[in-house]
């Protein structure tokens, strides 16, 4: 009984599921041991996908925002959202890289959404509500499972193979994943933090996760003003 109790305490300390609205994942330093593991609500092949998140960093080098690998050793980049400052972003779908030229951004919160439809192969990248020219990747395929979904590192193997030069340093918040392609109207709802519109695969409102190394959850202290785009302000947490 004592061993069972100790094991339960260990699990409770290493695995959490909670509403993280108003909070961030903080990755304070370059490292290969600091990262967050996200647990999907459902494990299944994904023929359609949308991922949205907010990020805040001063990094000027390449870094991963979200890495999804499968147990297939040939699919360490089944889905990868990879930033290449100052003006490129790469989206990997089943190992195929799709490079987008994007506007350079200042040091402020950035909202990013990526969607992929397997029937058409169309990949969309939205940054702060702006849709960049679309591309086509891996038509008629699917993203397999089981999956390892990690933030803070880029996986070169299932759950590992990290490179400190690709690690994320900064803050990430409002992470959501859907098993379908969001419409432009849905993208706008997510951009403006509509509390009634949350991911059905991963939801920041009910997130099961593990933090490793120096990664922590912290209250969100900054927000990005959207005044120059829309004459509005995004919601801030203090």
UniProtKB/Swiss-Prot annotation:
| Quaternary structure (record) | Homodimer; disulfide-linked. It is not known if it assembles into a pentraxin (or pentaxin) structure. Pentaxins have a discoid arrangement of 5 non-covalently bound subunits.
Signal sequence span is 1-16
Manner of cofactor binding, per the entry note:
Binds 2 calcium ions per subunit.
Cofactor dependence is on: Ca(2+)
Q: What's the name of the protein?
A: C-reactive protein
Q: Which SMART domains match?
A: PTX (SM00159)
Highest taxon, organism lineage: Eukaryota
Q: Where does Ca(2+) 2 bind?
A: 154, 156, 166
Q: Which family does it belong to?
A: Belongs to the pentraxin family.
The main location class comes to secreted
InterPro entries assigned: ConA-like_dom_sf, Pentaxin_CS, Pentraxin-related, Pentraxin_domain
